[in-house]
């Protein structure tokens, strides 16, 4: 809750909302209404239809997305950020030799990026967490997340802060820039889903398995446009970092956000990390920071849907490969692996990421490997560990946890994202060789971690991952299987029991952190004139008032098309601040429905085939005035990277027409002035052919809620019409006409 809003004012706002709605309020609604722009309480908003305008308390950016966010903020011509903001350098460090060396290499190879980000942070009054200081979401949880607050972040896993009772939403850089410039932030009023947890986790079951259960039920699209609110006595029994694992991976369901209702575990966590003032403030607002009684008594009157989960029946599970919603119980995995023909040997186990790198997570893993060590066993599989932050690293070092993991064979990587986002210089497996890895990450898309499309990545909990590292075999079940120690004795692992945090408290050492500068008038933002890494953004041209006529189709994608496919990371991360260079990866991983190739298409004008999409886009833009992209279901799933919208815009895309969109990507397309349209009839996707030309007509009549008409011209000259839907508001239509949202405000 915003400290600038006193309790009396908050209660008045909420009382007005209760009267307007004729019922009590959920926790999520309270946070939204207490951050509503304008004069709250005058209109009952319809979920999924109406927009709500909000003023977030905080903006967070990681270094790969902060570059474009800051370049856009600079165009807004403000002297300082209007809200608290931080930049976190966690995405550009490549995992190779280990923590100190990898950070040193990153500081050298990314010097101009770090100079730009640190100088712009200083110039505009933002906090700067330098390379090696921690993964953004763990750092936010430890230092900034607060019950009742509202935060936006330029990373899709920003809802991690929901584990500490904060409503946190992943956005694109344009949203962040506008909020930092003092403007409101607008989203469709979300559909509310209540998740009532009962019971307690048992044995090897973990918070990771709870979110896997949710993914099994809802899939990767079931959360779109929704906020999932977790509550109940089962929720109260989870630690803050367990809660954060669940809210973090709510992003995999496409949610707007996920959040836990404030409880005593949050008070304890805040005090343990040294945030006594925040803990005391939350305690004084405890009556506000909870659901109204109706949520427990008659949840159906508040929530669109109510989900019941008994934690006591949750079992340990794995997710994968290639999608986080393919869930297999650990006890069934060997049978499935044999049937599918997956390799039985584990080629690597990776522990960490923003999802599972807390003290409690690493304590559980250490318990497992210590038990193995007592029998003379070390990890059979290569074992890599990324601590969540400098504070976590110093704490596990102090408490002996680090030593246990290193003795078991763990290589300690920097406190950064590393292999989770493809920043992994992997040397043991050649590209194209089938292999299996287990990770505690949150995503397992094809080729995401190591660039190898034949790597089958499975997600699991830290304790199970540690047991698998020791066993080295994919089918090992730590609940029932035994291992023979070097001492000749057979043993079965004991189920780990880890505390919520260190009793001695979290280390206060923050490492490479620079607080906001108080006097920044004389500070200059550093951009090298001939930089190959940072480039000032062009101003996108305004809509010329004409219809889009007979545009070629750049690609019709088939199946899962994530932002990783549209604008890959890995080797391209270094160009995230250079729109010209980053656009050369356009749709590099997308599967062409016409040819079955990835990243290439046919020039329908010249007849040349196998052309990289960025070259094809350039040709179409220069010779036909642009192009359209056709997408399948949930187009743009995955990370919040706005490059997946900005690059198509830069290369000449006029519209993306899909069966459906992922929330953040659709918002990013709108921000960049691209029409985001969906087929009114899903079967029309199947009718689109490679040589078709697409005309989008009567654009001048574009109106909220009114369908758009497209005319499809076949190769033989015949035509047919297709009805398209859009979700543009009046304000967003003005963005389109202005050429981008940024154009509309500058």
Predicted segments with their positions:
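Fe-S-dependent hydro-lyases/dehydratases of central metabolism
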Residues: 1-746
